[in-house]
């Protein structure tokens, strides 16, 4: 449910940016690192929003992957430690009373 709400929020922002850009058909000069270009506002908004969205997903995906690898490593370590512990607990301890009943 949470992901559906996030998706709908992102979709609403994208639709609003395209709608606002479509109503403003004027050309703007966009200065980027190596050059500059004349673009329509709608195109510029859509491209920049999509690029930001993709970069955000990439960064979040890398963090998620790092957490999953760390979790898998920890689970393997837990399993290995449990396997080391289980042979020691398999030996049954028989209580021995030192006092002999007569």
UniProtKB/Swiss-Prot annotation:
Keywords attached to this entry: Cell inner membrane, Cell membrane, Coiled coil, Membrane, Stress response, Transmembrane, Transmembrane helix
Induction notes from the record? Induced by heat shock, via RpoH.
- Cellular component, GO annotation: plasma membrane
Instruction: Name where it mostly resides.
Output: membrane
Task: Write out the annotated subcellular location.
Answer: Cell inner membrane
What stretches pass through the bilayer?
3-23, 44-64
Question: Disruption effect?
Answer: Disruption mutant shows accumulation of a few incomplete LPS precursors.
**A GO biological process held by the record:** lipopolysaccharide metabolic process
Hey, which stretches end up on the Cytoplasmic side? 1-2, 65-102
Q: Name one Pfam family in it.
A: LapA_dom
Periplasmic side, ranges: 24-43
Recorded family membership:
Belongs to the LapA family.
Function, as annotated, reads: Involved in the assembly of lipopolysaccharide (LPS).
List the protein's name. Answer: Lipopolysaccharide assembly protein A
> What species does this protein belong to?
Escherichia coli (strain K12)
Upper lineage = Bacteria, Pseudomonadati, Pseudomonadota, Gammaproteobacteria, Enterobacterales
């Amino acid at each position: 449910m949470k992901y559906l709400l996030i998706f709908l929020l992102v979709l609403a922002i994208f639709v609003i940016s395209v709608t606002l850009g479509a109503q403003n058909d004027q050309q703007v000069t966009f200065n980027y690192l190596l050059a500059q270009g004349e673009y329509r506002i709608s195109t510029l908004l859509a491209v920049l929003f999509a690029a930001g969205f993709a970069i955000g997903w990439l960064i979040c995906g890398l963090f998620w992957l790092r957490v999953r690898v760390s979790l898998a490593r920890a689970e393997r370590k837990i399993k290995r430690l449990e396997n080391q512990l289980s042979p020691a607990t398999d030996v049954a301890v028989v209580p021995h009373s030192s006092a002999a009943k007569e």
